[in-house]
Amino acid sequence: MVARRTLLGWGLAALSLQGCGWTPMYADLATGPADADMRAVRVAPIPERIGQKLAIALRDSLNPSGEATPQRYILRISLQVVRLDLGVSTSGIGTRGRLEVYANFNLADIVANTVLLSLTSHANESFDILANQYSNTVTEDDAHTRAVEELRRDIMARVTVFFQRRAAAAAGRP
């Protein structure tokens, strides 16, 4: 009886969201109004290894099927990476590190040569500093990987919202 009421409650909640115009941001890019625009974004090369990882992750997210699409937009990103020692032992050696990555990005129309969106994203990851050099390399690389994923999610969300709002405005919806 309780399970039936719970199921009925969730069903009514889902139907009420449909009536208010709410749409899931990542439901299905293939049917979304911003799909063609998302696939038409070219990610400019980003220097350093962390930049290469971010560029590849963004390319895979913007065009998951890898279809050849005429490029109408370019996404330029500049990264600033800061590594800090947080915890310091009595001998003066760091025991905990923090990696801060700032991504200044802008989305530009290639044909009109105009900037459509210019924002900053920030990722903050921490890692252990160990006595073994190999372990340090692995933990710091893992922090870079986590930072790239955090930046990718944030940049994708912002670009997706931009294109969805633009498509809604073109269709005359609020």
Each model region followed by its residue ranges:
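Post-signal-peptide N-terminal segment of Sec-exported extracytoplasmic proteins
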Residues: 39-72
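Bacterial N-terminal signal peptides
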Residues: 10-18
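Bacterial Sec signal peptide processing site at the extreme N-terminus
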Residues: 18-36
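Surface-exposed short loop/turn segments
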Residues: 65-72, 76-120, 125-142, 146
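Short beta-strands and strand-coil junctions in structured, solvent-facing domains, enriched
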Residues: 64-65, 84-86, 158, 162-165
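C-terminal/domain-edge helix-coil "capping" segments
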Residues: 138-174
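N-terminal export leaders
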Residues: 4-8
